[in-house]
Structures are given as C-alpha cells and as structure tokens.
Regions:
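Surface-exposed loop/turn motifs in large extracellular/passenger domains
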Residues: 1-82, 86-110, 114-131, 135-195, ...
Length: 236
C-alpha cells in the first residue's frame, strides 16, 4: 500500500513522538516502518521525533524501510537519537528506493541515514546531519546531487554495537561497505565535516566512489574525482 504523511493543521505543530526508551525485543523498532516491496510512504511535512533524554544509549529510530519498502521525503523533519532513516541488512535482494528531495534528517548521537540494505538512495535536496555523521552506507547505491547538504558534526558516538554503525568513525559519508559492494555517486550538493573525516571507506568490500560535482569542506574528496569533474572546495 501507499501512505502520505503531512501536517495539515494551521499551527503546523503535528508530531509523532517516541514515548519510551529503547528496550530490546519489546520497544526496539522505528516509529514508522515501511515493510514489503509493495509498501511505500511519502513524507510531505510534519515532525517525527525519536530522541530520548540520553540518546546514545536509549535512541530511538525514526523511519525504517524493510523487505523492499520505499520512502520519499519532500519536506518535514525527522529527528532521532540514532537513525532518522534506516534500512535493514538482512534484505540482500529486496531493493528499497529512498528519495530525499527536501526536509531535515537529524541524528543527535549517530548517523542520520543508515543504508545496510540493497537498493538505491538519492539525496537531491534537504539537510542531512548527525552528531557522528550524515550517511553510512553498507551496501547498494547512494546518489548525492542537487542542493543536498550532508554534514558530520564529528562529536557523536556510534557505540559498541556488534553490527550497524557500531565502532565506525565519524564522517559526512561513511562508505563502510561491510555487507556488500557500496557505490557512491556525488554529482552535486555540499558535504561538510565540522570535525574528523569528510569521506571514509571500509575494507571488507572495495567501495566505488565517483565524484563529478559538488562542494566540499576540505580537499580530501579530490582523490575520488573523475575526468571533467566540476567541484568546489570551501575550507571550514
């Protein structure tokens, strides 16, 4: 089925809230889960708040895509203690399509967007920023283009989880690739690392990183430049 989320109130104060801390096996999922290859959701406006008082240990998660579910965001705000938007690494053949054209995706402790699943994610607008990083990809394809702004605060902690982002370094984009080949195409947008790394790579699988455009906060992205690339470096 298809679902559209929007705040149609005059005050624009509608909010979906995580009312409990993370608890294994009982309160441990996303506030909204898009499950199945025929399931899709578009978020046009509104606010999803999954931040607990101690987010490093108590989360929570915002929107989850599983088993090939698709998510489109054209506006609104998702703020989470852990991942604002995330997939699940168990899904190797079911391809999820995620499109972010506007809005805000925020993590107060970790990475804002976590991509361990198969499929393609395109961020062409909006703001994506996390205390640890903007996007962590373990498998699949990530396209960054348009007016997208992806920022790593470099101050967060990914924790010591046995999977997920556990133990990973902070970066605007972390191409960890622990579950398969990860391809990142940066055609535009802006990447900022307020501290630590702009782009980091894993070693389990060899990632593919192509930079043909965009604006970067340090010159480390230049090593991924392709022929005829047009990039800007604005030091911070």
């Amino acid at each position: 089925g298809k679902m559209t989320l929007k705040d149609s109130s005059t005050e624009k104060k509608g909010k979906i809230v995580a009312s409990q801390d993370y608890t294994a096996a009982s309160y441990n999922g996303s506030l909204i889960e898009i499950a199945g290859e025929d399931a899709s959701m578009t978020m046009e406006s509104g606010n999803i708040s999954a931040v607990r008082k101690t987010p490093n240990s108590n989360g929570q998660y915002g929107v989850g895509v599983t088993d090939g579910g698709d998510f489109t965001m054209t506006g609104g705000k998702i703020e989470a203690g852990w991942f604002a938007v995330a997939g699940n690494g168990n899904y190797k053949t079911q391809n999820s399509i995620i499109n972010i054209t506007d809005g805000e995706l925020i993590s107060t402790a970790d990475y804002a967007v976590y991509l361990p699943q198969s499929g393609t994610t395109t961020i062409s607008g909006g703001k994506v920023y996390g205390a640890a990083g903007g996007v962590c990809i373990q498998r699949g394809t990530l396209n960054v283009e348009g007016t997208a702004l992806i920022t790593s605060k470099g101050t967060g902690s990914t924790g010591n989880w046995g999977d997920g982002t556990g133990g990973l370094d902070c970066a605007a984009i972390n191409v960890s690739g622990a579950y398969g080949i990860a391809t990142v195409n940066i055609k535009g947008g802006t990447l900022i690392a307020e501290a630590k790394s702009l782009i980091t790579e894993g070693t389990t699988y060899t990632p593919v990183i192509n930079v043909t455009g965009g604006t970067f906060s340090d010159p480390s992205a230049l090593k991924y430049m392709k022929t005829n690339a047009n990039v800007n470096i604005k030091l911070t």
